[in-house]
Every structure is written in C-alpha cells, then in structure tokens.
C-alpha cells in the first residue's frame, strides 16, 4: 500500500483526545456504570460485560465510561477498532447520502445488489486485497467467513467429482436430504491445536483454544495438528525451533496421508491470537503450503485478527513471501466488513449452493473503503511499525527490570501485535484488572498471556503512557 503522508512524532492523529488516563471512581464500572449494567440485565445477557461505555465521549485511543473514567484502550474492542473512536473521517462519511441510502435500503445482495455494487466491492475490498487475490465473498462476521471458506472448499471437492452425465446423480440428490452419503459426503477440515476460528458449527469444529468455547456443542470429528511451540528469545533457540516446526509439518503430512476421509481444506492463523499469540516462522508456512499443495488441500489463511495493519503490513501473511497466494484469505474485525478473498473462479459454486439473504452488509463495505483510505492517507502502517519497535524495545527493558514478570516476549518486528506471558493465569487476570482501574484497558489470551491490540493510530506518546503503567503495576 503506497502512502500519501509522512507522520512525525509531533503529529497527533487526534489533537483533541485526552492527554492521558483519568480515573474518578474506586471501581470500574463505577456507580453509574453498575446501574446501567443492571438495567441492561433486564433484557440482555451481561455475564461477560466489562463495563458500559459512553461512545459519544470516547475519542481516538481513549474510552470513556459512564462515570467519566477515561482509559487508554490497547484492546480496541477485541482488535476491531482500526482508526480510533469517533474518527472524523468516518463520522463525516456516516452523514453522507451514500451511507444513508445504503443503511435505510439494505439489499438482499445475492439477488438485488445496488447499481454501484461493483464499485463498492472494488473500492471497499479488492483494491486492498492481499497480493494475488482477485475476488471476494462478503459475509457477516469472521466466524461466518471461515465457515463459508470451508463450504467453498467442500463444494469445490464435490462439484468436481467425475459423473456419467456431468450432473448430480439421483442418489446424491436424494441422500443429501437425509444427511447421508453420497450427497452429503464425509470430508474434513484440518486446523491446529490452540486455534480459534469462530463459534458456528463448522468454525467451532476447527476452534481448539478453550473448553468454554466448545463445551456442550456437537462437533465434526475433524483432525488437528500441533502448532509450533517456539522458545524465546528466538535468536537463542534457532535449532530447537526449526526442529519443532518440522515436527508439526511432519504431523500435517501424516494426517493428510492417513486420515480416514478426504481433507479438503486446512485453516491457520498467521499468529494464533485467542490461543495465546503463538507465532511460527515464514519457513514453517512455506513448508505448510507445499505440503497442502502436494495433497490438493485448499489453504485458508484466517486474517480475521491479524489483518488490516496491526503487524505493520496490511496482511500478516504477506510477510511470509509465499511462492503462491493462499487459496482463500478470510477477514473481519478491523476491516469492519467481513468476508473471503480468493483468486480461482473454480471456487465459485453453482447458484444457491452458497447463499443467504444478506450476503454481507453493504454499509460495512462502504465503511471499510473509508478506513483503508485513511490508513493510506495517514501512513498508518509506518506508524504501526515505528511505534511497535519503540514499544517492543521498552518491554524488553521492563522484562530485564522485572525478572519473571514479562516472559516469552514475542512479536518483534510485527508492529504492535505484541504479547508476553505472566507467571500464572491468576497473575495475568490481576494485572489486567489493576491496569483497568489505573486507566488502561488491556486484554489477555491463551493460558496466561497479555496481548496488545492497540489501534493503528496508537502513537509513541501513547506507548510511553502504557510502558509507564506496566512498569508501575507489573
């Protein structure tokens, strides 16, 4: 992505945002927040609510709650806010006739797309697609995008079976209505231990991160391979980590060779996020792609959380420099729109094999256009790289200053997509709670990890505030 502006340290993307956190209550939520949550509980499940937010007052990198507490947000709504709260560009776009028309006349895109849909799809998705990707299916969420990616791989496998007349057989047509073969064949999708790909029936079967996501739910008996468990610092464990990655590739080979039914797709995150911010080297992904190609298995890269700039490139997998583009790349979160990029028209099934009423949300496609243009205009990828380097160096210093508190620091050279392990799950949870009451909204992942997910407008002065708070509270 080319840039049209150069950001200096004196440039503030949000000149009117607070100078820093400000806490007015002894707890978060405070009295007003607790009262609002109680009112919500009459109609809405609040069991996972952290605190209600005043989104009218929130700005830039700062959340404001109902009691007037101001928090530096380095979790950004589970990595979904790309360019700040109440971004002026987005607010202006929201008041445009284009957005008003599309919001108030939401189309069933599969049947009745608006006249400008080709332009919207190009400007809001394809223009910023990963290298080599040419087409897009819009969906409603990251889970949905992954689910449909599996479906496209399965339908490609099924539709390309040789048949005497070229059309589906009577037995296939009849048996599928009874959830039976040959019309409903047994096929599988390979995923990796500690992965997270969503909570729908197919995507949940490939999610392997936490029991709470899966307990009580039926699941497809699909295979999983180990994701590399790298040792840190990376430069001190080169040989061990290479052996670990090869072990995982050998496991993939074994599964694809011996699984009892065809494995039609393999899905993987560039960095396992919910599962603990687990990394692997570009060499691992090169070997994985080669292994999948050998067995004619579709390669799906889940960029739902890693996509749209947090790693310093628009798409994390582009840092691997693969010889071929992945078969599919799924996206959501910071993109705001959700969907699947692909480059082979053969993945398009017959009409109505993949279909739903909405087939995406045209408003979100328009919103993504403004977001991605803002990323380019404000040179936010370079901002993420430079701030990420500064932040990582600061965390290295704190790790030396506080031995045993910041373990397995990872994400060097990956923008602000940084994480570390606390001593225990309890220590991690306490740290997150302490940071919140001291003005920083931060999140965890995996067993005992802290993951940083600031916005792309997170700057050096924000990083200095964050490092100071970590130093005080770790």
Curated annotation (Swiss-Prot):
Keywords: Aminotransferase, Cytoplasm, Pyridoxal phosphate, Transferase. The keyword Transferase applies. Its cofactor is pyridoxal 5'-phosphate. Pfam families: Aminotran_3. It is an enzyme of class 2 (transferase). InterPro entries: 4NH2But_aminotransferase_euk (IPR004631), Aminotrans_3 (IPR005814), Aminotrans_3_PPA_site (IPR049704), PyrdxlP-dep_Trfase (IPR015424), PyrdxlP-dep_Trfase_major (IPR015421), PyrdxlP-dep_Trfase_small (IPR015422). GO terms for cellular component: cytosol; mitochondrion. CDD domains: OAT_like. It catalyses: 4-aminobutanoate + 2-oxoglutarate = succinate semialdehyde + L-glutamate. Residues 1-13 have a biased composition (Polar residues). It comes from the Eukaryota. Residues 1-31 are annotated as: Disordered. GO terms for molecular function: 4-aminobutyrate:2-oxoglutarate transaminase activity; pyridoxal phosphate binding. One of its GO terms (biological process) is glutamate catabolic process. Its EC number is 2.6.1.19. The modification N6-(pyridoxal phosphate)lysine is found at residue 333. Pyridoxal 5'-phosphate binds at residues 142-143, 357. It is found in: Cytoplasm. Substrate binds at residue 199. Belongs to the class-III pyridoxal-phosphate-dependent aminotransferase family. NCBIfam families: GABAtrns_euk (TIGR00699). Required for the degradation of gamma-aminobutyric acid (GABA), which is important for utilization of GABA as nitrogen source. Deaminates GABA to succinate-semialdehyde, which in turn is converted to succinate by the succinate semialdehyde dehydrogenase. Cannot transaminate beta-alanine (BAL). Homodimer. This is 4-aminobutyrate aminotransferase. It comes from Schizosaccharomyces pombe (strain 972 / ATCC 24843) (Fission yeast).
């Amino acid at each position: 992505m080319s840039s049209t502006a150069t950001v200096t340290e004196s440039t503030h993307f949000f000149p009117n945002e607070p100078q820093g956190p400000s806490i007015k209550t002894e707890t978060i939520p405070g009295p007003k927040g607790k009262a609002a949550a109680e009112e919500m509980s009459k109609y809405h499940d609040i069991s996972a609510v952290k605190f209600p937010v005043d989104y009218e007052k929130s700005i830039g990198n700062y959340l404001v709650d109902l009691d007037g507490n101001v928090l530096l947000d380095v979790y950004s709504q589970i990595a979904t806010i790309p360019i700040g709260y109440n971004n002026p560009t987005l607010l202006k776009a929201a008041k445009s006739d284009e957005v008003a028309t599309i919001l108030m006349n939401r189309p069933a895109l599969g049947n009745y797309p608006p006249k400008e849909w080709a332009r919207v799809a190009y400007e809001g998705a394809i223009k910023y697609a990963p290298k080599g990707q040419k087409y897009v299916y819009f969906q409603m969420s990251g889970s949905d995008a992954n689910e449909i990616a599996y479906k496209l791989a399965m339908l490609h496998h099924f539709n390309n079976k040789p048949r005497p007349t070229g059309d589906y057989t009577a037995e296939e047509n009849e048996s599928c209505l009874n959830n039976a073969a040959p019309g409903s064949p047994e096929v599988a999708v390979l995923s990796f231990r500690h992965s997270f790909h969503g909570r729908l029936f197919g995507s949940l079967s490939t999610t392997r991160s936490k029991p709470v996501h899966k307990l009580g739910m039926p699941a497809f008996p699909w295979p999983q391979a180990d994701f590399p468990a790298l040792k840190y610092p990376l430069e001190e464990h080169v040989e061990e980590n290479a052996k670990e990655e090869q072990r995982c590739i050998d496991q993939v080979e074994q599964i694809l060779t011996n699984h009892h039914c065809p494995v039609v797709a393999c899905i993987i995150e560039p960095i396992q996020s919910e599962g603990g911010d687990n990394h692997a080297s570009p060499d691992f992904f090169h070997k994985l792609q080669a292994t999948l190609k050998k067995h004619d298995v579709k390669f799906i890269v889940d960029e739902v959380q890693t996509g749209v700039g947090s790693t310093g490139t628009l798409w994390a997998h582009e840092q691997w420099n693969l010889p071929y583009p992945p078969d599919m790349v799924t996206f959501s979160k910071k993109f705001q729109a959700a969907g699947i990029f692909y480059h082979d028209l053969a993945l398009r099934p017959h009409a109505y094999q993949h279909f739903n009423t909405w087939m995406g949300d045209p408003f979100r496609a328009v919103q993504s256009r403004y977001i991605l243009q803002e990323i380019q205009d404000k040179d936010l990828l370079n901002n993420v790289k430079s701030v990420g380097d500064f932040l990582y160096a600061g965390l290295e210093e704190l790790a030396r200053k506080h031995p045993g508190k910041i373990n397995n620091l990872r994400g060097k050279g990956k923008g602000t997509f940084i994480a570390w392990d606390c001593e225990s799950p309890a220590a991690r949870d306490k740290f997150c709670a302490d940071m919140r009451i001291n003005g920083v909204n931060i999140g965890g992942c995996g067993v005992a990890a802290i993951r940083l997910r600031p916005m792309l407008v997170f700057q050096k002065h924000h990083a200095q505030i964050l490092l100071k708070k970590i130093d005080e509270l770790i």
